[in-house]
Amino acid sequence: MKAAVCRRYGPPSVITIEDRPEPLPGRGEVLIAIESAGLTSADARIRAARAPAGFAPFIRLAFGLTGPRRPVLGREYAGRVVALGDGVSRFRLGDEVFGITDGMRLGAHAERVAVRADGLIRTRPDGMIVPEAAAFFFGGLTAADFLLDQCKLQPGERLLVVGATGAVGSAAVQIAHHQGAHVTALASKANLELARKLGSDEALDYRLDAAIGAFDVILDVPGVLPNALARLAPGGRLGLVTASLGQLLGAMIRPRRDSDRRISANVIKETPEAMARLIALYTAGAYRPLLAESFSLAEIVRAHAAADSGHKVGNVTIRMPKIQ
């Protein structure tokens, strides 16, 4: 099978297309012929061994010292079940599925991937197109976890989303709008109209630093908003999606020191329940993954460059060769 392989950390050009053995599904696993895969900011960070301040050593400890131990990156996928391991009854051959690879196994940037049948895999809902399915979970699960679980966003509260048209921010604007919050979006000038279409009540150019007033919740996706705590109303909550080690430690300490304003920077929950909630939001018309550029597997170096640009709108997806 063809796969995108990362054998050493570095710029997008370190990714090569190679022929690799097709995986065999073990007991309790299914083999997926991938039609499309998401290429997320997390994939780009792993490829470059790039992390928020203070976390760089941990990336190499977790994934490999000089290059990823599992050289085929990618976690989000959409495809079709083409083989069943022993003991699998939940799926049948030909089922159209989407999901997230198991734990740190990665492997979705390839024509085939084997995953646990009882893991983070679901049958694709009627009407959901393949690119949506491939880009469904990364931004959506992150946004829902921060807004609904960590920051406890309530109807009528004022929310500021920093980075409102990326994968996470675009999902957050939609989910918060559905939740009945008043949403202010910070984005580039070129993306203000898009932010409004996603459901924001106000859309402001982040370069002007015009987000004034007291917000009940701030979701800072890139972790760059100056004086964020000072912009919170009493009892306000700050969600830091991309947090430095110092910010994470602060989030752990501050609730004990200051019950008035809180910082949340916890790892999100990837559970069947979280997936089901996001699918329910999709079914209710409250969430659609924002699709950006789509690249063929052969163009994956360009896809990584797009993810690295810092100006990515929505989700980048990878198209696989036609399923045989």
Show the residue positions of the predicted features.
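Short glycine-centered segments of the SAM/dcSAM-binding site in methyltransferase folds
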Residues: 96, 158, 236-237
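A short acidic, Gly/Pro-enriched loop at the edge of an enzyme's catalytic core
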Residues: 210-217
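C-terminal capping/lid region of NAD(P)-dependent oxidoreductase domains
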Residues: 286-290, 304-324
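Short glycine/proline-centered loop/turn elements that form peptide/ligand docking sites
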Residues: 85-87, 183-194, 222-226, 245-247
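Glycine-rich phosphate-binding loop and adjacent beta-alpha segment
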Residues: 224-287, 320-324
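Mid-domain Rossmann-like dinucleotide-binding core that forms the NAD(H)/NADP(H) cofactor-binding site
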Residues: 133-205
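NAD(P)H dinucleotide-binding glycine-rich loop of Rossmann-like/cofactor-binding domains
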Residues: 64-67, 72-78, 90, 99-163
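Glycine-rich beta-strand-centered segment in the early N-terminal region that forms part
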Residues: 21-38, 52-103
